[in-house]
Amino acid sequence: MADTAAVHPTADVENGVSVGKRTRIWARSHLRRGASVGDDCIIGENVFIDLDVQVGSRCKIQNNALLYHGVVLGDEVFVGPGACLTNDRYPRASTPDGSLKADTDWVVSGVVVERGAAIGAHAVVVGGVHIGGWSMIGSGAVVTHDVPAHGIVVGNPARRIGWACRCGHPLDAMLVCAGCGRVYALRDSELVELN
């Protein structure tokens, strides 16, 4: 753990967790062994970060968020309060023979979230999903399929309703951002920045 990291006394940071410089971990959060959190992150209260989860630098994970084994967050990712990033598409408590599942019985299918994406409050992202950079997941959305870079998705199941700028504002019909003036174009179904 970096000397400049700040960990609340009620947080449970297990042995083998890597915490970067100037990262702050608030009350009652639990980071399990093998987890890695980059520099300049804020981990809110009561956050759960499971085994081997990777969190990039300059991320903000709000209160009560749950990041399960297999989750990888790029730099500058926002995870809203109560959001849940899962890791098992076919969960069961027991094996077909009726015995309780052990760690080795789980097939982990993690979630990958690229740089700058934002996941809204109480959104659920199922295992195996890839969230493109600078995308925006609406509050309460249930994401069952990959989200393209800059895509805005909402609902249950989540569906794309538009495109987001790097600054977070939605793009207009001409793919221009009213917030910062950036201009985009669609090329082979991918949004690319022109300026």
Describe the role of every protein-language-model region:
Residues 181-195:
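Short microdomains enriched in Cys/His and/or Lys/Arg
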Residues 160, 169-172, 183-186:
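Cys/His-rich microdomains that often coordinate metals
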Residues 1-2, 195:
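Basic/polar N-terminal segments that are highly enriched at the extreme N-terminus
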Residues 115, 172-174:
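Intrinsically disordered, low-complexity terminal tails/loops enriched in metal-binding residues
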Residues 132, 174-177:
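Short, solvent-exposed secondary-structure boundary motifs
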